[in-house]
A protein has these predicted regions:
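Active-site loop/oxyanion-hole signature of alpha/beta-hydrolase fold enzymes
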Residues: 60-102, 106
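Flexible "cap/lid" loop of the alpha/beta hydrolase fold
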Residues: 125-160
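Bacterial Sec-dependent N-terminal signal peptides
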Residues: 1-24, 220
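Conserved HGGG/HGGXW glycine-rich cap/lid loop of the alpha/beta-hydrolase fold
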Residues: 28-73
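Conserved hydrolase catalytic core segment
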Residues: 97-139
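Conserved alpha/beta-hydrolase catalytic His-Asp/Glu region
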Residues: 136, 141-142, 158-215
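Conserved loop-alpha-helix segment in the C-terminal half of the alpha/beta-hydrolase fold
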Residues: 221-257
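Catalytic histidine-centered segment of alpha/beta-hydrolase-like enzymes
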Residues: 256-265, 269
Length: 278
């Protein structure tokens, strides 16, 4: 009986510990105007540190990192909605006002989601290579109901050997940046990620459709895109995806891939600084 009580106690402690895991981790730096830096899928908040160093004027950075990535304990699914919920709670608790949101990829999705809910607290938004509805571009015509956690592709990814997953990570990293040293870094982030978060979290992203929220966002928005495969394909996609935004500027980088901060850093800094100075 005593042994049973001890085991039960350990189970409760373990369960409570998992339940209390935070969906986000935030590192602060600097002072003055709050800038919430939202990285993309698998990326840590530190991916934005060089951008922060190159911002003109005084800013207080909030570098966000996500559960399940970069050594942060995973949380139960659904994942994306938990990130958004905790970010909104963080902003309210910290009483942040006149916030600049800067988000890459999935971070751009979170920026849209946050601005739609807390519009009176947001001053400007910078979205870097993010789509409001990925599945429309990647898998047009596929209904949202088709995206479930339990599906053959997800199960294959969850059960993949380390070698097979590393090969997949290598190919994906090569498609995200032209910088070979950064490809190695991206591959490392993917391999070190909690596998279930990596697989199921991406399913969460495929379910997203933020287009209905765009009309509620009144603040200026800068949308920066990578010219891959080419500008003639990319620009119409961005224009269509963000047609609901009333106050937007869209610019496409001269070259590079998804991680614009790696492939075109000076162009990125110039675009953001010009936008924030208006």
């Amino acid at each position: 009986m005593r042994k049973f009580i001890v085991i039960l106690g350990l189970m409760i402690v373990t369960a409570n510990t998992f339940a209390q895991n935070k969906a986000i981790r935030i590192e602060e730096a600097g002072q003055d105007t709050p800038v919430l830096f939202l990285p993309g899928f698998i990326s840590p908040g530190t991916v934005w540190k060089e951008t922060f160093k190159n911002l003109e004027g005084k800013h207080k950075a909030y570098f966000v990192s996500y559960a399940g990535f970069n050594g942060i304990e995973p949380i139960p699914m659904p994942w994306y909605s938990a990130l958004k919920k905790e970010l909104v709670e963080y902003i309210i608790t910290k009483k942040l006002e006149k916030i600049v949101l800067i988000g890459h990829s999935m971070g751009g999705n979170l920026a849209v989601d946050i601005a739609a809910e807390l519009g009176d607290k947001i001053d400007r938004i910078v979205i870097v290579d993010a789509l409001t509805c990925m599945r429309e571009v990647m898998m047009p015509g596929v209904p949202v109901e088709s995206f479930q956690y339990d599906n053959p592709y997800n199960n294959q990814m969850l059960n993949a050997t380390d070698k097979a997953f590393q090969q997949t990570a290598t190919m994906m990293a090569q498609g995200m940046t032209l910088d070979t040293s950064k490809q190695t870094l991206l591959k490392k982030w993917m391999i070190e990620a909690d596998r279930k978060t990596y697989v199921y979290g991406y399913t969460d992203l495929l379910k997203l459709d933020l287009r209905p929220l765009l009309s509620s966002i009144k603040v200026p928005v800068l949308i920066l895109g990578a010219p891959f495969p080419d500008k003639e394909v990319v620009l119409p996609n961005f224009e269509k995806q963000y047609v609901g935004l009333a106050n937007k500027t869209i610019a496409i980088a001269p070259s590079g891939r998804h991680f614009i901060m790696f492939d075109q850093p000076q162009w990125l800094y110039a675009q953001i600084n010009t936008f924030l100075s208006k």
